[in-house]
C-alpha cells in the first residue's frame, strides 16, 4: 500500500489490456494478400495436415492465418479477408481467413453451419 506522498510523486498507472490480435490494429477484419499457402502439423496429441497461409496485411504485418473448412482455392497472390481467432493446436496461428469473401470461395456442399464458411442457402 503506497503512502500519500508516494501517490503524489507518481500516480497509479491504469492496467493496459493487451490485444490477442495486434496485426488487425483494432479493426474487426483486415484485407491481405497470400504470400505462401502450405500445411503444418498440429501439436500433440492431434495429428493432421492443417491448411494455413502466410498473409501480408494492409496494416503492414505478415501473419500466419488458418484456412477453415474442407478444400480451398487460396493460392499465392489471392486477396483474402482475415479475422482474429486462434487455432488451439497450431502454435503461432492467431488469425482465420474469412471464407466466402474476396478471393476465398465458400466451402463446397456445406449443409450445416453455412454462415461460418461463406455458403449460400441451397435451393
From Swiss-Prot:
Biological process according to GO: translation
Keywords, sorted A to Z: Chloroplast, Plastid, Ribonucleoprotein, Ribosomal protein, RNA-binding, rRNA-binding
Main location: plastid
PROSITE patterns referenced in this protein's UniProt entry, alphabetically: RIBOSOMAL_S12
GO cellular component, one term: chloroplast
Compartments where located: Plastid, Chloroplast
GO MF entry, a single one: rRNA binding
Subunit field text: Part of the 30S ribosomal subunit.
Function: With S4 and S5 plays an important role in translational accuracy. Located at the interface of the 30S and 50S subunits.
Family: Belongs to the universal ribosomal protein uS12 family.
NCBIfam families from the UniProt entry: rpsL_bact
Name used for this protein in its record: Small ribosomal subunit protein uS12c
Organism for this UniProt entry: Oenothera elata subsp. hookeri
Taxonomic placement: Eukaryota, Viridiplantae, Streptophyta, Embryophyta, Tracheophyta
Amino acid at each position: 500500500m503506497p503512502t500519500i506522498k508516494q501517490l503524489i510523486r507518481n500516480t497509479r498507472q491504469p492496467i493496459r489490456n493487451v490485444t490477442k490480435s495486434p496485426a488487425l490494429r483494432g479493426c474487426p477484419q483486415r484485407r491481405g494478400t497470400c504470400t505462401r499457402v502450405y500445411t503444418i502439423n498440429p501439436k500433440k496429441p492431434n495429428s493432421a495436415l492443417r491448411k494455413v497461409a502466410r498473409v501480408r496485411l494492409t496494416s503492414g504485418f505478415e501473419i500466419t492465418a488458418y484456412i477453415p473448412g474442407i478444400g480451398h482455392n487460396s493460392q499465392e497472390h489471392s486477396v483474402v479477408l482475415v479475422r482474429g481467432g486462434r487455432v488451439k493446436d497450431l502454435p503461432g496461428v492467431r488469425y482465420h481467413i474469412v471464407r466466402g469473401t474476396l478471393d476465398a470461395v465458400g466451402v463446397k456442399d456445406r449443409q450445416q453451419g453455412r454462415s461460418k464458411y461463406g455458403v449460400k442457402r441451397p435451393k
